[in-house]
Design a protein with these regions (language model features):
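Solvent-exposed soluble domains appended to multi-pass membrane proteins
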Residues: 1-318
């Protein structure tokens, strides 16, 4: 991530193992916000559509209990993946969808990441002074499809040895996201209020988009080894703060652990579940639909039982 190459101070970077590729953003959201894992749920399931039907403990509800204002943002239809119904059940006070993004700019018909940054800053500046905020933003700019129908993208990115319009468009959009992240960090570097920014991908694009990369290696998406296939479920993540935090590079994690890692890095008191997750990470460093190596172990079974309780049986009592 170019915008962070000069910002090693107070930064943690690494790769996040997620349970989806090419789509189903909601499942990565679910893992990050709840600390639960898709590895324990049926293949093809979407918790936002099938399992979250009542108040469900999450990072948002926990931070709300600590006095935080909690905001969710997604610059598209509010009903997508049932977000308008799910976010309140996860403890968000407010949800801003596309109709709340006034005066936004667009890329390929989607509200762009720069406008998302503007909305984050606007929300931060309007919140109650002295009250901390948790702002969860799911961007839309880089959503598929990627075609050669849009010729107005600035700073076209190509890969030597390939002639793929899809790949070029995708990488150009990622470059624009990098610029938006830099804009966000530049703003909060100037703020006195302690702030942590966590930036991560929801999933990689479809096989068709990255096929030219494999072709350069003499391979195809259809003949990848198990290890190579797992690479298709990795996305970058960054934790940055405008105050002193421990620094780390090239870390490996999975989406269910990232929320607890963020809280620990920020110096925010952890919930009992988050403390549990960080202990579990020592025994199971990675867990996702693609990382089930610990299946059947005591650590796996204990985690699975606790997740079932929190997702299906929890009644709001501590």
């Amino acid at each position: 991530i170019h915008s962070l190459q000069q910002r090693a101070e107070n930064t943690q970077t690494g790769y996040l193992n997620v349970s989806v590729k090419g789509g189903n953003t909601a499942n990565t959201e679910f893992e990050f916000l709840t600390g639960d894992t898709m590895a324990f749920l049926p293949a093809g399931s979407i918790p936002y559509q099938q399992y979250i039907t009542k108040d469900t403990p999450s990072m948002a509800s926990y931070l709300k209990s600590l006095g935080y204002e909690t905001y969710a943002m997604h610059p598209y239809y509010a009903s997508g993946w049932n977000r308008d119904k799910i976010y309140p059940l996860l403890g968000f006070d407010s949800f801003y969808s596309s109709t709340d993004f006034y005066g936004s700019t667009y890329e390929r018909g989607y509200i762009d990441d720069s406008s998302c940054v503007d909305k984050i800053i606007e929300t931060y500046e309007k919140k109650d002074a002295g009250t901390p905020a948790f702002i969860f933003n799911v961007t839309m700019q880089n959503h598929s499809p990627y075609t050669d129908g849009y010729q107005n993208l600035q700073g076209n990115v190509t890969v030597d040895g390939t002639v793929s319009a899809q790949l070029s468009e995708y990488l150009t959009l990622v470059k624009l996201s990098d610029a938006a992240l830099e804009k966000l960090i530049d703003y909060f570097e100037t703020q006195d209020e302690p702030t942590v920014i966590v930036f991560f991908g929801d999933h990689q694009p479809t096989d068709a988009v990255v096929e030219p990369i494999w072709n350069l290696e003499g391979k195809s998406s259809s003949d990848l080894t198990e290890e190579e296939n797992q690479l298709r479920y990795k996305v970058p993540y960054v934790i940055w703060a405008n105050y002193d935090i421990d620094e780390a590079v090239n870390q490996e994690s999975s989406a269910n652990y990232l929320g607890a890692q963020m809280m620990e890095a920020a110096g925010i008191p952890l919930s009992d579940y988050q403390n549990y997750l960080l202990e579990q990470k020592k025994e199971m460093p990675l867990i996702s639909t693609q990382h089930t190596e610990a299946e059947g172990s005591d650590a796996w079974l204990n985690y699975q039982t606790l997740q079932y309780y929190l997702l299906f049986d929890w009644d709001g009592e501590k």
